């Protein structure tokens, strides 16, 4: 598989920050074999989605996934060589005719889920001067390209990536990918977006990105990223988060996230000029925390991101709705509690309520986001209520096994025609196992 790597301004800027010469990393002395790890991750997932207005109202799927990830250490020397490899398999436990469609399993004819799907891949890697380079199948998580991990198996991307950590607290990264393997498929495909009515001919040939992440100041995190989805958009992201401890019991946490998205090249999805931001303020007192958030989309197209991915780092992105329609305003209240305060460590819960409003008569009709337009959508409103309960075993043979129960209720008025009324229940059991 060949990759046409183009040195865009993003990569020139990233390369300029990497030292030309530095002492070789001490951790490469671990060796190719001595520094190797093998981790297994088993996930059992059950999804029940009841969309009130859909042709298939009661969608139910249940599956078992397994992921094996091997990561070698590095050979000795100024430049160390290493190898990563992974294998995944997903098995259908339930999802018969007429009930498929929750997206944890691949779809087949007659609304039946396939019985099994699997994939394997790997990446070569080099490390030197505090810089790591990888080429092959990548697990990525950042604000402009993040593999989806909310289903049974994780999403991966095929391409190259480089990471530099020369300065304590500062991480620089960049890369370019040309294909993705979605979380419910075996094979790779070109990259498309989540909310557009995109045809295969409009898929992008590649995505390039570069960014910086700062965590070197106590209580402060900040990120700046830029990405080019070829012939679709340029997307820029920035965030700032600060945790201020008032005393040993109480802390305050304000934060802000901002995206700017602009069409580029052939503009395959049409004209895009979108600014989307969210702010949050959390008060934590002991084992309790309360969060208030506000989110706003400025633009006649929705805020969009990579299909089936998680690169929406916004406060009001919920289990069912992202509250990201054209020109939408939304707010959220959330309460979290850690039951360690009652002598039950490992048990936690979260309850949130979100509400949004948009004028969909102003949504663009001349782009691939035309489905959001509604001539009667001047007063489009919707809300979502989410309730999560999670338990992580603290000791014994089941240590680190977690059970997550999630329930969401979503309702919209007739003016919000692009989204369903929905009741959704999920059960996710994760068991990570470190072999060596």
Show which residues each predicted segment covers.
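Outer-membrane beta-barrel translocator/channel fold
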Residues: 91, 173-197, 201-203, 249-330, ...
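C-terminal structural cap/anchor segments
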Residues: 294-379, 384-390, 394
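Beta-barrel outer-membrane channel/assembly domains of diderm bacteria
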Residues: 2, 9, 20-140, 387-394, ...
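Residues on the lipid-exposed face of transmembrane beta-strands in outer-membrane beta-barrel proteins
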Residues: 40, 66-72, 122-126, 160-164, ...
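Repeated loop/turn-to-beta-strand initiation elements of outer-membrane beta-barrel proteins
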Residues: 77-80, 130-134, 169-173, 181, ...
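Outer membrane beta-barrel
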Residues: 70-102, 109-190, 212-216, 220, ...
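Transmembrane beta-strand segments that form the barrel wall of outer-membrane beta-barrel proteins
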Residues: 44-46, 133-147, 172-174, 210, ...
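Residues that define the transmembrane beta-barrel architecture of outer-membrane proteins
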Residues: 34, 60-66, 116-120, 154-158, ...
């Amino acid at each position: 598989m060949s990759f046409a790597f183009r040195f865009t301004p993003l990569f020139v800027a990233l390369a300029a920050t990497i030292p030309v010469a530095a002492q070789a990393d001490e951790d490469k002395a671990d060796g190719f074999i001595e520094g190797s790890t093998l981790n297994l991750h088993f996930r059992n997932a059950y999804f029940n989605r009841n969309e009130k207005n859909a042709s298939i109202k009661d969608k139910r799927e249940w599956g078992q996934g397994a992921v094996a990830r091997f990561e070698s250490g590095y050979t000795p020397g100024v430049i160390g060589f290493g190898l990563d490899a992974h294998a995944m398999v997903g098995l259908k436990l339930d999802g018969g005719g007429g009930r498929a469609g929750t997206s944890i399993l691949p779809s087949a004819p007659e609304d039946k889920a396939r019985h099994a799907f699997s994939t394997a891949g790997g990446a070569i890697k080099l490390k030197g001067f505090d810089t790591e380079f990888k080429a092959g199948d990548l697990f990525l998580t950042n604000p402009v390209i993040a593999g989806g991990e909310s289903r049974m198996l994780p999403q991966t991307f095929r391409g190259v990536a480089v990471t530099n950590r020369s300065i304590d607290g500062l991480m620089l990264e960049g890369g370019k990918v040309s294909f993705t393997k979605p979380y419910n498929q075996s094979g790779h495909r070109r990259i498309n977006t989540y909310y557009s009515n995109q045809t295969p001919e409009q898929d992008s040939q590649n995505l390039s990105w570069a960014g910086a992440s700062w965590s070197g100041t106590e209580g402060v995190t900040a990120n700046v990223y830029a990405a080019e989805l070829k012939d679709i958009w340029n997307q820029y992201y920035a965030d700032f988060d600060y945790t201020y401890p008032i005393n040993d019991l109480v802390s305050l946490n304000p934060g802000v996230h901002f995206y700017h998205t602009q069409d580029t090249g052939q503009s395959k999805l049409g004209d895009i000029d979108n600014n989307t931001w969210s702010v949050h303020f959390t008060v934590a007192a002991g084992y309790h925390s309360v969060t208030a958030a506000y989110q706003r989309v400025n633009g006649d197209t929705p805020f969009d991101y990579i299909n089936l991915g998680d690169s929406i780092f916004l406060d009001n992105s919920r289990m069912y709705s992202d509250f990201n329609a054209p020109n939408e305003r939304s707010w959220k209240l959330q309460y979290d509690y850690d039951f360690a305060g009652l002598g039950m460590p490992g048990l936690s819960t979260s309850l949130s309520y979100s509400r949004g409003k948009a004028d969909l008569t102003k949504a663009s009709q001349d782009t691939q986001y035309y489905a959001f337009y509604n001539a009667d959508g001047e007063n489009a409103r919707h809300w979502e209520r989410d309730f999560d309960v999670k338990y992580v075993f603290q000791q014994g043979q089941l240590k680190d096994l977690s059970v997550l129960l999630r329930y969401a209720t979503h309702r919209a008025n007739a003016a919000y025609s692009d989204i369903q009324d929905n009741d959704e229940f999920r059960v996710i059991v994760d068991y990570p196992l470190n072999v060596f």
